[in-house]
């Protein structure tokens, strides 16, 4: 018995003790490492991970490492090193680590966001980018689709005029319909249970991700029961059942002469692969229903919650800074008025609004730490050696709050993105990557930027957004999951008198 126990402990020590580094190699400074548990006892246990990593830079520098179980992770908190990882050596660091919770989400690394580097990821990213190119003009112009959902949202909010409400649900419904049009070429009708179901699935998944971090750090304990993981699996199963039903319906109605959405593009790619006309990357195995569903789920997950979350952050900051809101509304009144919807072409005139959006993305980035990358070959970052299969985390929070790069980074200052005259947008620092960069950059960046501008402009054109009756200001700390979520808050919706007068005149003329 004792012999077996000693053998077991020696085996664990061999597996989890850091291996001897190559001669002459220089590695990033590491947190202390113990057998089996690695650096876990030395990682801060309170607070948010991105902030803790930022504080660790004071001791270990802008690039450091730690070890959990048998896995080494390198953390980057400098924009030059981050761009080396994301851009200069983007292909070398384009892998994704195997993480239990994300494997559940991605059906074992299918789709785009959590897929490992390889032909499948490259193909589905290419198909997603091709889809967004459909929406650059004509009847499918993305701006028109967004503005239609903004009108539906604003008409609903007008029925709650004078009330204090939480915008989370109506914003998620609006964003879901936009993504639905991109993926399926249809929007859900008001009250459709499928629409509410998708929102509920996304909420359930977001609630689960990050709660079971020990299962991600130590895969060996996955045999232990977890109610959170079971809830997550159930949400994913129900989501996939709904998406599979939509996919089957789209297959039946597919026409190669009318390609209007993501499912059409993927079905077309599969049809071409079956007839050997799709090119070498169009492998039938990579275009299975499960691969398609994973990609659609990625677009929904990223396209709905990220934009909805940022709009909520923008509204929260406007409640904290009512004079800023008034200045933005004055610019909207002067440059747009009340007789047409805001357009992307108005960005050059509404520079304070655009600067506010950029500052929100700096101050409270959607993903304070980017989804981890993985070195697919032996490589280097700066002067340091990085072994193959090392995980690399870019701490966006550190980039966006670096005192050497930003003037008073802990203050919310939209004017930092404006020139001294306040009339031109500028880039005050290179340490700014709200959507990542390189091969793994956000495929929906164009969609997100348009949504943030048009939703904020549309809301402020029609409504005054004020503190609720209890006077409670939103908490601006946030809770990180897949995205940095703001705590629930309420805002009083008041339809603007100038808007009502303009539309009363229009209806009687």
UniProtKB/Swiss-Prot annotation:
Q: Known catalysed reaction(s)?
A: a C21-steroid + reduced [NADPH--hemoprotein reductase] + O2 = a 17alpha-hydroxy-C21-steroid + oxidized [NADPH--hemoprotein reductase] + H2O + H(+); progesterone + reduced [NADPH--hemoprotein reductase] + O2 = 17alpha-hydroxyprogesterone + oxidized [NADPH--hemoprotein reductase] + H2O + H(+); pregnenolone + reduced [NADPH--hemoprotein reductase] + O2 = 17alpha-hydroxypregnenolone + oxidized [NADPH--hemoprotein reductase] + H2O + H(+); 17alpha-hydroxyprogesterone + reduced [NADPH--hemoprotein reductase] + O2 = androst-4-ene-3,17-dione + acetate + oxidized [NADPH--hemoprotein reductase] + H2O + 2 H(+)
Pfam families for this protein: p450
Q: Which UniProt keywords apply?
A: Endoplasmic reticulum, Heme, Iron, Lipid metabolism, Lyase, Membrane, Metal-binding, Microsome, Monooxygenase, Oxidoreductase, Steroidogenesis
Q: Per the record, what is one GO cellular component?
A: endoplasmic reticulum membrane
Main location per the UniProt record:
endoplasmic reticulum
Residues that bind heme: 442
Q: Which GO MF term does the entry hold, naming one?
A: steroid 17-alpha-monooxygenase activity
Name its co-factor(s).
heme
GO BP, one annotated term? glucocorticoid biosynthetic process
Quote the pathway field.
Answer: Steroid hormone biosynthesis; Steroid biosynthesis; glucocorticoid biosynthesis
What family, per the record?
A: Belongs to the cytochrome P450 family.
Q: Output the PANTHER family linked to this UniProt entry.
A: STEROID 17-ALPHA-HYDROXYLASE/17,20 LYASE (PTHR24289), STEROID 17-ALPHA-HYDROXYLASE_17,20 LYASE (PTHR24289:SF13)
Per its record, how is this protein called by name? Steroid 17-alpha-hydroxylase/17,20 lyase
This protein's species is Sus scrofa
